[in-house]
């Protein structure tokens, strides 16, 4: 059974939208399965890539993303939150890091017969380790434990 977020992520990948799954879904893909309310993605911030993203989002849920434009995706910290079947947070910069900075720190998973990139444990730890959020601290601890288990 495909979840709504799996369908959307596969759709974005098929359309050649350049993105990396970050946040709770990436933590789960690295082996620490936990619930998460949203899906976080970091996108490459070129106008062409954002246009592909927006084209694919027009059919997402009720289609509220049709109201977005390329200008809504600024090169600054913070996410554009799109709430449809689930909340989707779209970042162009996350903790000072851009898509180009993190693409080398990704792994690939197969969703609906298409490869989708997600952030590896080391990079996730780097993004989350200075966070004040309790969930981020739990994630860092769990990811470090998983890394320690894998290295022994």
Name these PLM-found stretches.
Residues 1-152:
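Compositionally biased terminal segments of proteins
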């Amino acid at each position: 059974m495909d979840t709504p977020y799996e369908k959307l992520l596969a759709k974005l990948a098929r359309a050649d939208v350049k993105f990396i799954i970050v946040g709770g879904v990436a933590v789960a893909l690295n082996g620490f399965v936990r619930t998460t309310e949203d899906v976080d993605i970091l996108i490459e911030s070129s106008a062409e890539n954002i246009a592909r993203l927006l084209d694919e989002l027009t059919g997402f849920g009720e289609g509220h993303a049709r109201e977005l434009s390329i200008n809504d995706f600024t090169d600054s910290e913070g996410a554009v939150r799109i709430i449809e079947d689930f909340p989707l947070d779209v970042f162009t910069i996350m903790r000072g890091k851009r898509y180009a900075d993190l693409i080398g720190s990704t792994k690939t998973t197969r969703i609906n017969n298409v490869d989708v990139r997600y952030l590896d444990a080391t990079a996730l730890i780097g993004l989350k380790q200075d966070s004040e959020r309790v969930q981020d601290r739990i994630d860092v601890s769990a990811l470090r434990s998983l890394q320690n288990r894998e290295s022994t």
